[in-house]
Amino acid sequence: MADAKVKVLIVDDDAFLSGIYATKLELEGFAVISARDGEDGLKAAMKEKPAMILLDVLMPKLDGFEVLKRLKADAETKDIPVIMLTNLGQKEDIEKGLADGAVDYLIKAHFVPAEAVDKIKKVLNLP
């Protein structure tokens, strides 16, 4: 990541967890943008055009599934890969996220930030 840093948008109302992921991503050389709810997440995605979005599901204003649908319905954001990062681990939730266009679905309790960073790098074809 020589000159321009790759931008990752984290949309999560959990400031503590979001901060942990942001720190790990920044240490790996990414530029991180954070949003605390679905509405702000959509606005940030439109404005910043990140290379990747980490998206929580349970959030105020708009939930992650609705944010994902709107991102995928908009020509400007439809090609941004989205990884769902949530505590919702029911089979139906996972299937819904993937069917709606997420490239991966990570359950927070099952992954540490380093593993999420590895998945981001894999999706973006980064070393």
Predicted features by range, described:
Residues 1-7, 114-127:
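Non-catalytic signal-transmission and effector/linker regions of two-component phosphorelay proteins
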Residues 29-36, 44:
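Short hydrophobic/Thr-rich beta-strand motif most characteristic of the beta2 strand and flanking loop
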Residues 4-16, 21-25, 53:
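Conserved acidic segment of CheY-like receiver
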Residues 48-54:
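Active-site beta3 strand of CheY-like receiver
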Residues 59:
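Receiver (REC) domain active-site loop signature in two-component systems and cognate sites
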Residues 56, 86:
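Active-site residues of response regulator receiver
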